[in-house]
Amino acid sequence: MDKHRRDESPSGLSDIVEPDGLLGTGLTSRHIEAFGRKVTTTAGHLMAPSSTEATTGSHYHSAMVDIQRELRRPNTQRRVFSLTQTTPTDLVRSKLSTTEIQSRAISSLPDDLLANIPEDSSSYSLFEGFQASQDDHEYRKVHRRRISKGKKLLKDGDARAALPSTPTDLKKDRDILSRRLDLMGVRKNMCSSEIHEIDNKIANLHNMRKIVLDRLAGLEMEEAELEHELTELDNKLEDLQEEQPESQAAVATPKSSEANEDSFVSEDPAMDASFMSESIYQKMSSPKSIKQRSIRKRSMPILHEHFAPGSQIKEMPAHNDMVTAIDFDFPFGTMVSAALDDTVRVWDLNVGRCTGLLEGHNASVRCLQIEDNIVATGSMDASVKLWDLSRARSVTRDGRVNKDDEGEDTADDAHELFQSTTLEDCYVYSLDAHVDEVTALHFRGDTLISGSADKTLRQWDLVKGRCVQTLDVLWAAAQASTLGGDTQWRPSGRLPDASADFVGALQCFDAALACGTADGMVRLWDLRSGQVHRSLVGHTGPVTCLQFDDVHLVTGSLDRSIRIWDLRTGSIYDAYAYDKPVTSMMFDSKRIVAAAGENVVKVYDKADGHHWDCGAGVGADAEGPSPATVERVRLKDGFLVEGRKDGIVSAWTC
């Protein structure tokens, strides 16, 4: 039977169980000692690998010895087994498994370790401490106080805040605050040093940028000179190619020195008439044809794109009186200006120097246009003259044209020569058909349209040099009134202004012509039929300037307003006004610039609708002399040129 019970014990403890023992349970002192040794060995085996110090292993060993001693006492045994209904053998068999013993040995802590834990006298709970240790952004947004900033974290001294401070603690706190204050000073000095370093870097970058801009300006000047020389060589080659067939034809027709005088007299009267007709036509003066020699720009100037908007590029004292007309072909290219001093000057915008004068008109020039090499000027002498700048001779270093290479002049003589030199070879021909001053003109391709104070518009063929069509503005207005239309001549109801021309502005494109007149109306003409296609009514004063593109037409008037029209519907797309009358206007892809009777150019940004001023009057000293009023403006690719009442012409970035 004993053998059978020993074999049934799966834990190997059946050899210590006997029917008789302490308290009638069969558990003797020898059995308890054996059980204690096994538990001690098992616990030491389980806990030793997790202990890193020898003291920890000895601690567990002594704890097990104490447990063994307690279990050997009869009182302890009675208390332990008094409440159990089963024998200790059954308890050990059913409850104390290997997994449970391992779990209890790991999770249980002795009283010695628990006795060393200090008592927490802090009034903060564990959860409150966890909340205080977090970076509470919402709290900082609501409570932005300098004192509470950075004071959310709990510190060791917070628990002792309620206790009375000792001098030692106060000195310690003072030293800590003093050190923090010193660190703040060091950090401020570091920030100041970084700011100075950044300022120095920015200044160095500005200097480097200025150096690169100067280098770019030099490259563009050199590029302009090379392109000018290349254009001259191309023109010479074309002239040689034209002269070569003429010389070959002259050589192919030999002159007979033995010819009789009677051979020049023919018996056939028809032949005599043919000969006389040919000789007459050879002696008649025929107008020179315009030969379009386009300027071959391989690259456009980009220097002005690197300046801030509103920066001045050049200022030239161009004339001695008010500027009446101004135009240029492209940025840093060729500019032509006219004024009431009866002069027309050609300028090189790249260097800001006058290259010559266009002389031939008997009065002041009121309007002009430059396209490639061709310049058209309309004057108060009722004529339109055309000039070909590609025929000009090489310009000397002192700005003179047609200067002889022989001889040297003094500075005064050079200045006088510069003032009297003209581009005489550039004159092509004159268009004389108007009977009053020409106030507006525009040409594109082989077609030129001119408007005059004689209340007519004339269409010119630049190839033949003659007028092909005359448009009567008054007749068109009367015709529209007779047909019952809403377009008729509408007097403004006030005294005519000296600057209010009958034809204030015009522009043509193929068969389309837009014309603004003194009655405040803008008429759209069809050059194929010579009829008014549409009339735009809106201005209450004379129209002084206009320009259109594919979709919109922009007009300026003496009624102080600028109106943007939709060409597709004929309605007003946008409008704005200034304090004084608008005398000149032009736009590009980004901005609309206007001269509105002030010493600044009015600029309107198309994208955001922002209005700002550009010119010498911006930031001018109120006590000093005020710049003159802007009379004429021209804008191309962000390059602005404005002419003033005192004759000064300036170039700006816009």
From Swiss-Prot:
The keyword Magnesium does not apply. The keyword Zinc does not apply. Residues 209-253 form a coiled coil. Transmembrane segments: none annotated. GO terms for cellular component: mitochondrial outer membrane; transferase complex. InterPro entries: G-protein_beta_WD-40_rep (IPR020472), WD40/YVTN_repeat-like_dom_sf (IPR015943), WD40_repeat_CS (IPR019775), WD40_repeat_dom_sf (IPR036322), WD40_rpt (IPR001680). Pfam families: WD40. Gene3D superfamilies: 6.10.280.220, YVTN repeat-like/Quinoprotein amine dehydrogenase. Keywords: Coiled coil, Membrane, Mitochondrion, Mitochondrion outer membrane, Repeat, WD repeat. Residues 1-20, 240-264 are annotated as: Disordered. It is found in: Mitochondrion outer membrane. It is a peripheral membrane protein. PANTHER family: WD REPEAT DOMAIN 5B, WD40 REPEAT PROTEIN. Involved in mitochondrial fission. Acts as an adapter protein required to form mitochondrial fission complexes. Formation of these complexes is required to promote constriction and fission of the mitochondrial compartment at a late step in mitochondrial division. This is Mitochondrial division protein 1. It comes from Aspergillus terreus (strain NIH 2624 / FGSC A1156).
